[in-house]
A protein has these predicted regions:
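A short helix->beta-strand "capping" segment at the edge of beta-propeller domains
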Residues: 22-37, 206
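Beta-propeller fold detector
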Residues: 30, 72-76, 115-119, 162-165, ...
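Beta-rich, blade/repeat-based domains predominating
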Residues: 34-51, 78-94, 98, 103, ...
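Beta-propeller domains
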Residues: 53-72
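A detector of repeated loop/turn-to-beta-strand junctions in beta-rich toroidal repeat architectures
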Residues: 59, 101, 147-148, 189, ...
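A short loop-to-beta-strand structural motif that recurs across blades of beta-propeller domains
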Residues: 61-63, 103-105, 150-152, 191-193, ...
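Short loop/turn segments that connect beta-strands within beta-propeller blades
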Residues: 65-70, 108-112, 154-158, 197-200, ...
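Blade-level signature of beta-propeller repeat domains, shared across WD40, Kelch, NHL, RCC1
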Residues: 260-300
Length: 300
C-alpha cells in the first residue's frame, strides 16, 4: 500500500480469460472499468476463479468479482477496520491484514464469518501477507511516517512473533515454492530482501536479493517456478525476476501505480493487478501458473 482513496464504485466491465492459446502473453488489458473503486488493493483469487480485493467503496469492504463478471460486496470488516493484503490458505479460508486495527482476520468462505486471528498492538499497520504451505502467515508492517518497518510471523496457533525490526518500509511479501525462502521488499528504499525459513517457521540469514535505482515497490507474488513478480509503483509496471534475481521481463500495466497482484483464472496463468491511479483491475496472461493456484490444484 502506497496511498489510498475511497471513491464511488464504478461499473464493472469484464472479460474473463480462459485460454492462453488465443491470447497474447505479457500484454495487459483492462479487467474492470476505470473508477471501479478507490483504494483498490490486496487482490487474491479463490479456487473457483473469483477475484477479491479491498476498498470496495469503503475501507472495510471486500469485493468479490465472479468468473461471469458480477461484482458484489463479499463481506465488511468490523467497525474501525481497513483491509489491505488478502491471502487464502489451502482449505479456502481467507486472511486479511487490517492495517488500522493492528489485526489479522480470517473469513469463512461459506458463512462469511469474520474471526480475529491476532491482535498485536506492537504492529505499525499490518500491510501485506504471505502464507506458507502449512498455514504459517508472514506479515509486512511498515511505518510510512518514519520510513521504517517490521516483519511478523503468525504461527498456526495464532501467536505473533516479530521476526525483524528496524527495516525500511516493508511491503510486498512472498514465500518461495519450496518453502525455504521468504521475500520482503522495502518500498521507499527500493530493496528486496530474502530470508531463510527454518523448520519452525522463524527466519534467519537476511540478505539483499535485488535493488533498483528508481521507483518504488508494492505487492509481489511467485509463480510455480519461483519467479517473482513485483509491482513497480510509480513506474506502472510489473517486473518478473528469476530465483537468481535476473530481470526476465517487465510488463506495462496501463497505469502508473500498481499496488498489488495475484494469479488466477482457469489455468492459473492470468495475473490480476490492482492499479490505484485509475482505480481499477487490469490483467495479463503469463506462461506459467502462480504458486497459490498450484496449491489449490494440489488440495482438490
Amino acid at each position: 500500500m502506497i496511498s489510498r482513496g475511497f471513491g464511488v464504485i464504478g461499473v464493472l466491465a469484464m472479460q474473463w480469460a480462459l485460454s492462453t492459446s488465443a491470447e497474447t502473453l505479457w500484454s495487459a488489458k483492462p479487467f474492470s472499468s476505470e473508477g471501479f473503486t478507490g483504494g483498490i488493493e490486496g487482490p487474491a483469487c479463490d479456487r473457483d476463479g473469483s477475484v477479491f480485493c479491498v476498498g470496495f467503496g469503503d475501507p472495510r469492504n471486500i469485493a468479490r468479482v465472479t468468473p461471469d463478471g458480477r461484482a458484489e460486496r463479499f463481506v465488511a470488516l468490523p467497525e474501525g477496520s481497513a483491509g489491505n493484503g488478502i491471502r487464502f490458505d489451502r482449505s479456502g479460508r481467507m486472511y486479511v491484514a487490517d492495517y488500522t486495527a493492528h489485526k489479522i482476520h480470517r473469513i469463512d468462505p461459506v458463512t462469511r464469518e469474520v474471526i480475529q486471528v491476532v491482535h498485536e498492538p506492537r504492529m505499525n499497520q499490518p500491510n501485506d501477507l504471505a502464507i506458507a504451505a502449512n498455514g504459517t502467515l508472514y506479515a509486512s508492517d511498515p511505518n510510512w511516517k518514519d520510513s521504517t518497518g517490521q516483519l511478523w510471523r503468525i504461527d498456526t496457533q495464532g501467536k505473533a512473533h516479530r521476526e525483524a525490526e528496524s527495516m525500511g518500509t516493508t511491503n510486498g511479501i512472498e514465500v518461495s515454492p519450496d518453502g525455504k525462502r521468504l521475500y520482503v521488499n522495502e518500498s521507499i528504499q527500493r530493496r528486496i530482501w530474502v530470508f531463510d525459513i527454518l523448520g519452525d517457521g522463524s527466519l534467519e540469514h537476511r540478505r539483499i536479493f535485488k535493488e533498483f535505482p528508481d521507483y518504488g515497490f508494492d505487492g509481489m507474488r511467485c509463480d510455480v517456478d519461483g519467479n517473482l513478480y513485483v509491482t513497480r509503483h510509480g513506474k506502472g509496471t510489473v517486473v518478473k525476476l528469476s530465483p537468481n534475481a535476473e530481470i526476465l521481463r517487465e510488463i506495462d500495466v496501463l497505469g502508473p501505480n500498481p499496488s498489488n497482484l495475484c494469479f488466477g483464472g482457469a489455468d492459473g496463468c492470468t495475473v490480476y493487478v490492482t492499479e490505484a491511479h485509475a482505480k481499477r483491475l487490469v490483467s495479463f496472461r503469463v506462461d506459467r501458473p502462480g504458486l497459490e493456484w498450484s496449491r489449490w490444484k494440489a488440495a482438490r
